[in-house]
A protein has these predicted regions:
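Periplasmic peptidoglycan-binding/tethering modules of Gram-negative envelope proteins
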Residues: 2-110, 166, 180-187
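Short glycine-rich, basic-tinged beta-strand/loop micro-motifs
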Residues: 108-118
Length: 187
């Protein structure tokens, strides 16, 4: 499949009359790097299995995970060069609970950002990041989708951690859902 020649900088999915909130919670810490590390033997093959490299595939991150303020839902360990979500991940209990919360809590709005590891040309990474974000967006129910302000790739060369290990690259092949409550200055 050919990589698109141009990827929009605006939200990938046009959102109906919904402006991005001003007071998003601060994003989880990130690393900006242009370093490229090679895949290890069998790293790609293992990444394409349901088990992948990390357990669990869905985690809460950001402020203290036990605190509902400024939590982010991180869906990680996508297969190398995959945009789709693994079947095992789709049945994750935390993912199911959070999707239900997102659908029923009408005060929440969302920003969804896709990430990739640093391997391969940046143009391909933007394609993967965009596809991952869009696929996670489509997991949301109709109410939560209608309250999503941003669905797009993360900034080029921005990662959750340095890509120097197998686990770090699996962590970076991810999507983060940033919830926001306009009723509060910051959630």
């Amino acid at each position: 499949m050919a990589v698109p020649a141009w990827t929009p900088t605006d939200p990938v999915e046009k959102m109906p009359n919904l402006q991005p909130p001003i007071n998003w919670c601060p994003a989880p810490p990130k690393v900006v790097s242009t370093d490229v590390f090679p895949y290890q033997a069998n790293e790609i093959a293992i990444s394409l299995t349901e088990g992948g490299h990390l357990t669990p595939d869905v985690v809460l991150t950001g402020a203290a995970a036990s605190n509902s303020l400024c939590q982010f839902l991180l869906i990680r360990d996508f297969g190398v060069n995959w945009r789709h979500i693994k079947a095992l991940t789709l049945h994750d209990a935390l993912l199911s609970a959070q999707l239900q919360r997102f659908e029923t809590d009408k005060t929440l709005q969302f920003m969804i950002l896709g990430y990739s590891d640093s391997a391969g040309p940046e143009r391909n990474n933007v394609f993967l990041r965009t596809g991952r974000a869009k696929n996670v967006f489509h997991l949301l129910g109709p109410s939560a989708r209608s309250r999503t302000a941003v669905v797009k790739p993360a900034t080029p060369n921005e990662y959750f951690t340095v890509n120097s290990t197998v686990a770090a690259r699996a962590q970076n092949r991810s999507v983060v859902i940033h919830p926001h409550s306009p009723d509060d200055a910051i959630i």
